Curated annotation (Swiss-Prot):
It is found in: Mitochondrion inner membrane. It comes from Ajellomyces dermatitidis (strain ER-3 / ATCC MYA-2586) (Blastomyces dermatitidis). It catalyses: a 4-hydroxy-3-methoxy-5-(all-trans-polyprenyl)benzoate + H(+) = a 2-methoxy-6-(all-trans-polyprenyl)phenol + CO2. The gene is COQ4. Component of a multi-subunit COQ enzyme complex, composed of at least COQ3, COQ4, COQ5, COQ6, COQ7 and COQ9. InterPro entries: Coq4 (IPR007715), Coq4_euk (IPR027540). This is Ubiquinone biosynthesis protein COQ4, mitochondrial.
Amino acid sequence: MTPAVTQTILTVRIARPHGYGYVLLSRGFSALNRPPPNYPGHIPLTTIERGALAVGSAIGSLLNPRRGDLIAALGEATATPYFIYRLRDAMLSDPTGRRILRDRPRISSKTLSIEYLRSLPPNTVGRTYVGWLDREGVGPDTRAPVQYIDDEECAYVMQRYRECHDFYHAITGLPVVVEGEVALKTFEFANTLLPMTGLSMFAVMRLKPAERERFWKLHLPWAIRSGLASKEVINVYWEEQLERDANELREELGIEKPADLREIRKMMRRQKAAEEAAKAKDGQ
């Protein structure tokens, strides 16, 4: 006799926006009964699956902060049900944010002409952006598509945040080293409230003692001060700001430019080399 196949159904209660609040909807999941995707590439998750994804990606990204795929998964797993809706609502309440949601622009090498950006005058936003890309050895095509956010519009909001991240780097001048990433993520947390950006602060534990001290004394106060004081950076239509003066845009947004971290690190290395050379000379 063929054994009966037992199917276990998990009922998930998820928050959906409704008017000025949220309503809870029940959704049945099983290995044989998964809802269809809401947009290309969408992967619906149960509450248990989302929790496992959040925990696993958090641990993995802490062990290896350079794993962008894990950081992206952590961002999506922890953004719902509230935080990504808050960010979407911030866009809806702003005229430029509403235009972005309507136009759905994407940032990639197909939508931005890198050669044109290199031709712009120094200190324009576009020239600053491409100069930062060249200096850090990265490109605009490294952002993975959103998969785990159920609401299609909110998925775009997360994609937009993700693709604008390098503009945040460029406008602040922070490099892609772990110290710079943690500083920028702290700024983003104060500005966007996305949990992943706040959780990224745990990567401070992986910094060297001197870097950790520099974060607490220099980067953290700057990030909180600028993140809270500045306008919502998700509402910047970067594609329309490329020819503007970068200092003018920073002033308009209320972003204080931090100390040049790469120059600080170079200075510290030179100082350490000089001290070691002096010790070696004294030992002769």
